[in-house]
Amino acid sequence: MNRYFFKSSHPFVSSSYYVLMLLIVMSTTNPIVISICFLASVSLRLLQMANNKKSGLLYPMVLVLLLTLTNPFFVHRGGTILFFFLNKPITQEALIYGFFSGLMIASVIYLFQAFQASVDSEQFFYLFGKRLPKLTLILTMIFRFIPLFQQYYRELNQVQKTLQRTQQRSFKEKAAYGLDLFGNLFSWALENAMDTADSMKARGYGVTKRSSRISYPWRIQDTAALLLLIGCSGAFFRALTKGYYQYNFYPYTESFTLLWQNHGWNYVLIIIVAFIPIVKRIKEGIIWAILKSRI
């Protein structure tokens, strides 16, 4: 059973989902929309990392906490004053705005992580390699850079620990070790990029149109999923232009309950789009359990 959801779907369908989700979460400051997208993106990452360490999920949450705590010290708008700091009002509205801004950024980070796990380089080349070969190569290298950088950092740090270079006590020696480690990582990144570029140039990449070595057949399920994505997201953007998702944090925050009561069906559209992979995962889990029970 595939835990990466869209791996069994056509690459165009999976890419369309992530593009639409990014457009939805970044197109409005509506707290309900942001919360739905955040829950969906976190659920995606949790299920993708089912058997792996989940420490990577904490970093975006730290960013949410930082934005929540720091925004009131820079933005003093709002009518509900909690207290004064250096004769500046710290307002509840600024606190809430910082929290949902952090959720928006965290959702974007989780979606990019889920996209990287669901759409591999082969699928990315299949979609865009024929028309934009050079840009596709650059984007693929960018997507691979951070995971490779982290992997090489762990390997290099482990070697230094074996050589007991991390046992220095003075601050000067620790700083020298950190600079040396960063220099090695930077040199490796440049060398790796040059080797990749030279290798692709030697193979004639980008000179003529290239075909993909893997074929991805289009199925009826792909058509149904794409129509559902386009239909629900199209209805969302149409409602967005009419102001149905407008929300004001200042001078006073509006009631979330009132938002849902007035435009509840519009938020159902977001739930359908956001949780399509989760529903697909549950469906596959049920089918897998039934098949196992028949063995």
Q: For the regions a protein language model found, what residue spans apply to each?
A:
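Short coil/turn helix-boundary motifs
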Residues: 9, 49-50, 131
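Transmembrane alpha-helix interface motif
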Residues: 2-46, 159-295
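Interfacial helix-loop-helix linkers and transmembrane-helix boundary segments
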Residues: 35, 50-58
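Alpha-helical transmembrane segments and their membrane-interface exit regions
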Residues: 39-50, 63-68
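Juxtamembrane/interface alpha-helical elements of multi-pass membrane proteins
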Residues: 56-172, 286-295
